[in-house]
A protein has these predicted regions:
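Extracytosolic ligand-binding ectodomains
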Residues: 13, 24-431
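C-terminal motif of bacterial Sec signal peptides marking the signal peptidase cleavage site
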Residues: 19-23
Length: 431
């Protein structure tokens, strides 16, 4: 009897040490390995991994995304009559930590992984996700390499340079601006690509190859933008695309106000969804500003209303949800729909129908093995979920209508938020 007690105490001590030193992710691995009796309960749950930066320099964004996932989980906590269990991995905003964390998450066999914010920590996870054949959905990372190099990594937002098309549509079709200029920082490749799409779209819409009256670059080592601002004034531009990050944009706009260049509409990037920049713009009644976003309460679907109501109920009526939280809410629901669709597909297909989908004997055997596994466990495999995620069309999300159209890059409407006279005006939607 004493031996049994000593062994139990030893296990508990080791467990406490492991949990204290390495955190909950390692604890879950420890529990799965040494307490197999819990496997019955695990079969009644479907796991969704959260690979996010909840500490480190990206933690503000990471925490906002986790809020959206958890809120969706509170509203929709089951799928296929099974409880959805959220398992967490904090990459600490570090590619080195992220490499370990993603492997720990994968070892717990999640059906889908959500995250991360931050391009580097997302890219470092990509190869492991692909090797494990687990579909993942990045919520806010927009680097095209994430989805281009990995068919298992999906985006829940629009590709970065597409905002150039949307802003051109807004400027020309929505506001009648047919004489425009562009501004970017020197050596900013992403801004260069986005501006190229903007200018090409403007030329196509207007039918005028000379509608771009100025293309300006700002030196990274100088904060004096007087020369460029005066050049814009002389150009006669009616709208200016400022492909600048929030801090530089605020400095530029402040100087434009000081120099009384306020008769133009300033078009910004998605990154302008920034609290400090928004506070500044709203404090300047002479500024006329528009910028793209995945989310606006002024453009509402039934899911948007559900999301906002749930958010305010949990966090307070005076609290406003961020774009990141809305997209994360959608990413979780996209995962659930793909899981449900995948299992429905499995149950509808016969073994012969599965075999007929593949040409070689090896692929047929692998597909049939996964088909049998899903039927036995009641949980579809990663490949099956990935297949159905690709097929999602016209998904009604809090951040808009989302489709994948057989790919892993989201196609969705882009909302152009508009602030004039210090107040938010009616938003414009580009399909």
């Amino acid at each position: 009897m004493r031996k049994h007690i000593k062994r139990a105490v030893s296990c508990l001590l080791v467990l406490a040490m492991v949990c204290g030193m390495t955190g909950c992710t390692t604890y879950n691995n420890f529990k799965a390995a040494f307490f197999p009796g819990d496997k019955v309960a695990q079969e009644k749950t479907i796991k969704i991994g959260i690979y996010e930066a909840t500490s480190g320099k990206l933690s503000d964004q990471g925490k906002q995304e986790v809020m959206g996932i958890e809120l969706a989980n509170e509203l929709y906590g089951t799928v296929l009559d099974k409880k959805v269990e959220l398992i967490y991995g904090d990459n600490q905003s570090s590619m080195y930590v992220g490499e370990t964390v993603i492997q720990e998450l994968i070892s717990q066999n999640p059906s889908v992984i959500l995250g991360s914010c931050g391009e580097t920590v997302t890219l470092i996870a990509s190869d492991y996700i692909k090797a494990a054949s687990i579909p993942a959905i990045t919520i806010s990372s927009t680097n095209p390499l994430i989805t281009a190099n990995n068919e298992f990594y999906f985006s829940a937002t629009f590709e970065e340079t597409r905002q150039g098309d949307a802003l051109a549509d807004y400027a020309y079709t929505g506001r009648g601006k047919d004489v425009v200029a562009t501004v970017k920082m020197q050596n900013d490749d992403t801004a260069t690509a986005t501006i190229k799409r903007f200018t090409n779209r403007m030329k196509k819409l207007s039918g005028d190859s000379k509608c771009i009256v100025g293309s300006y670059e700002l030196p990274a080592d100088s904060g004096d933008y007087t020369q460029v601002i005066e050049a814009i004034r002389e150009s006669g531009a009616k709208a200016v695309f400022l492909a600048l990050q929030p801090a530089a944009a605020q400095a530029f706009l402040q100087q434009a106000v000081d120099l009384r260049l306020t008769h133009v509409t300033w078009l910004g990037e998605r990154s302008w969804n920034n609290e400090d920049l928004m506070d500044f713009i709203k404090s300047q009644p002479k500024l006329d500003v528009a910028y793209p976003s995945d989310f606006s309460q002024k453009v509402s679907t039934s899911r948007t209303e559900e999301f906002v109501q749930a958010y305010k109920k949990k966090y307070g009526e005076d609290m406003e949800p961020s774009e990141a939280t809305a997209i994360a809410f959608d990413a979780y629901l996209l995962a659930l729909q793909a899981i449900e669709d995948a299992q429905n597909m499995v149950m509808e297909l016969t073994e012969d129908q599965v075999r007929a989908r593949y040409e070689t004997e090896a692929t047929q055997k692998a597909a049939i093995a996964e088909w049998k596994q899903a039927r036995e466990t009641g949980i579809p495999t990663g490949r099956q979920i990935k297949m159905m995620l690709e097929q999602i069309e016209n998904f009604n999300g809090a951040s808009g209508i989302i489709s994948y159209n057989g790919k892993n890059e989201a196609t969705k409407s882009i909302t152009i938020n508009y602030i004039s006279g210090g107040k938010e005006q009616t938003a414009y939607v580009v399909g």
